[in-house]
Curated annotation (Swiss-Prot):
The protein's name: Arminin 4364
Keywords: Amidation, Antibiotic, Antimicrobial, Immunity, Innate immunity, Membrane, Secreted, Signal, Target cell membrane, Target membrane
Top-level taxon of origin: Eukaryota
Protein task: Antimicrobial peptide with a broad-spectrum antimicrobial activity. Keeps its antibacterial activity under a wide range of salt concentrations that mimic physiological conditions of human blood, which is surprising, since Hydra is an obligate freshwater animal with nearly no salt tolerance. Does not affect red blood cells.
Keyword Signal: yes
């Protein structure tokens, strides 16, 4: 009989000090969000540290505005030839 009262007493204390369901749900949600953000930060750091293997390494050549640079090529060649 004493063990039954002890278990009931402990259950009563646990229910008295237990948080509400919404508080527990909010805390779990915050912890999960925190872990996700930490994982994303780690992955971002790893991607920034690692050299990305580009499938088209000469892509930057296409980005050069050749029409604007072509008129200056003879000037550069002449300047290099004088040295």
């Amino acid at each position: 009989m004493k063990t039954v009262f002890a278990i009931l007493f402990l259950a009563f204390i646990a229910l008295t000090y237990a948080r509400s369901y919404e508080d527990v749900k909010e805390e779990i949600k915050n912890e999960v969000e925190k872990e996700i953000l930490e994982d994303l930060e780690k992955e971002t750091d790893e991607l920034n540290e690692r050299k990305i293997n580009d499938a088209k390494p000469w892509r930057w050549v296409r980005d050069i505005r050749w029409r604007k640079l072509v008129p200056f090529i003879p000037v550069v060649v002449a300047a290099v030839g004088k040295k």
